[in-house]
């Protein structure tokens, strides 16, 4: 699918980057990315992928906005309290970039609906706040051979994972979390969270999506990036496939 004249202007500052160019921008336009969970992580992912020009973006969330969300969920304002997140993000993204297609689902992800929700998309991005959902996305992304980009945050800490399940040698989320953690682990509701870590982790997730689409850069696939903003500690750890 070719780029229109207004798209060439809109994306001109990234098209001039040698690693992207016209060819890379076409790949971005032709891609389909699903974002599950529109909170602290999903908001920056949705914003930056829409600004980057991802051609089709899927949005899944069943929750409403409350006052405690506002400090870290960058697409919402006080006036949005009580509204459904998926509706607000959909409207915002359409204003940011009217050239892209949005598929929005006001649903709670579960075992019975997940396959039909994710099968259409190339890349699945996890922005959920519980490990049951993360492991469900991990399981079905693996079964359907998708690229899966996952994030988790708590306090000043963040984890970013990327898995390319089209490769049978890829490890998975359970390679890091051997069992599903208790809800208290990396749970911003229980432990608290600063808004900045949500923005940083979400932005890196969006960047990993772009790298996977275009096929550029040093890949995080099969690895975890561990971040602590309090001590400015950034570490990459290789993951091994569980047999």
What are these regions (language model features)?
Residues 1-243:
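Adenine nucleotide-associated cytosolic modules
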């Amino acid at each position: 699918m070719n780029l229109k004249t207004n798209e060439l202007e809109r994306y001109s500052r990234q098209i001039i980057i040698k690693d992207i160019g016209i060819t890379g921008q076409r790949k971005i336009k032709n891609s389909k990315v699903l974002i599950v969970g529109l909170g602290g992580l999903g908001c920056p992912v949705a914003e930056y992928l829409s600004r980057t020009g991802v051609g089709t973006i899927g949005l899944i969330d069943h929750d409403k906005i409350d006052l405690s969300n506002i400090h870290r969920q960058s697409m919402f304002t006080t006036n949005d309290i009580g509204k459904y997140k998926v509706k607000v993000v959909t409207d915002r993204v359409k204003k940011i970039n009217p050239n892209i297609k949005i598929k929005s689902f006001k649903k709670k992800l579960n075992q019975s609906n997940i396959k039909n929700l994710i099968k259409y998309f190339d890349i699945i991005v996890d922005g959920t706040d519980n490990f049951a959902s993360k492991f469900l996305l991990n399981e079905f992304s693996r079964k359907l051979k998708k690229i899966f980009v996952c994030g988790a945050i708590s306090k000043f800490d963040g984890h970013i994972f990327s898995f390319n399940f089209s490769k049978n040698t890829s490890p998975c989320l359970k390679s890091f979390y051997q069992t599903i953690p208790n809800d208290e682990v990396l749970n911003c509701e229980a432990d608290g969270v600063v808004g900045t870590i949500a923005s940083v982790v979400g932005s890196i997730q969006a960047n990993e999506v772009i790298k996977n689409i275009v096929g550029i850069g040093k890949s995080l696939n099969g690895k975890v990036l561990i971040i602590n903003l309090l001590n400015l500690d950034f570490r990459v750890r290789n993951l091994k496939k569980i047999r």
